[in-house]
Design a protein with these regions (language model features):
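Acidic active-site catalytic centers that drive phospho-/nucleotidyl reactions
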Residues: 47-49, 114, 138, 203
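Acidic, Mg2+-coordinating catalytic module of metal-dependent nucleases/exonucleases
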Residues: 156-219
Length: 219
């Protein structure tokens, strides 16, 4: 079974609330060379799982994960998973509803990969692009400025291990996510699909953790 509630034909939503991080009301974004702090509830951490890593018009996102802090400080994690090709438009419409004009996106390499891919999918679906004009904190860039040449690489898995002490166990690598989805579409098991959701969940939690580390560390 695919986790979550089917909110449209072939589109499943999972949602969880948790205590994760203790953000101040205003997040110091000087680490990203921004002049002004950002209220924590404006931040939307997002990460996609796709049919391939190359990008381009032939690549589609079959899952969008997003997480934000509510006004009371609780961390809300939501994931949209498509189980049919035809559910993509409903997923894109739903994700657009999660964005406000003052939303600030938080990603890891999302400026180069996730955001352009989603913009392409909105265009091909003939839907308005809700990402244009939004602020975007791509944490890969400040991580590289601080630790390139110090760590073996600056992948998110390395950053979460070095900064947060996170060591993943039984994690399905992101490179195997396309096969997990295609296997399910062809009538196969949902076991690896659920492992992708777990992988995406940790990605979102690590995004928030790395963000807070960068914001709170002396420079």
């Amino acid at each position: 079974m695919v986790p979550g509630v089917e909110i449209a034909p072939g589109l499943f939503l999972t949602e969880a609330l948790m205590d994760w991080g203790r953000p101040a009301p205003l997040i110091d974004t000087a680490f990203a060379r921004w002049d002004e702090p950002v209220a924590h509830h404006r931040l939307l951490h997002f990460d996609t799982e796709t049919t391939g890593l190359a990008g381009g018009t032939g690549t589609r996102a079959w899952m969008i994960g997003a997480a934000d802090w509510l006004a009371d400080g609780r961390f809300r994690l939501r994931q949209l998973t498509t189980t049919t090709m035809g559910a993509e438009a409903a997923m894109l419409r739903t994700f657009a509803q999660w964005l406000q004009p003052d939303t600030v996106l938080v990603s890891y390499n999302g400026k180069c990969y996730d955001s352009p891919l989603l913009k392409t999918r909105y265009r091909l679906a003939r839907l308005p692009d809700p990402l244009s004009g939004l602020g975007h904190l791509d944490l890969l860039h400040p991580v590289r400025r601080h630790w390139k040449g110090v760590w073996e690489n600056c992948r998110l898995a390395t950053a979460e291990r070095e900064l947060l002490g996170v060591v993943r166990e039984d994690d399905l690598p992101g490179s195997e996510a396309p096969a997990a989805w295609l296997t399910y579409l062809r009538g196969g098991s949902a076991v690896n699909l659920r492992r992708v959701l777990a992988h995406n969940t940790q990605d979102l939690k690590s995004l928030a953790g790395v963000l807070l580390h960068l914001a709170e560390s002396p420079r």
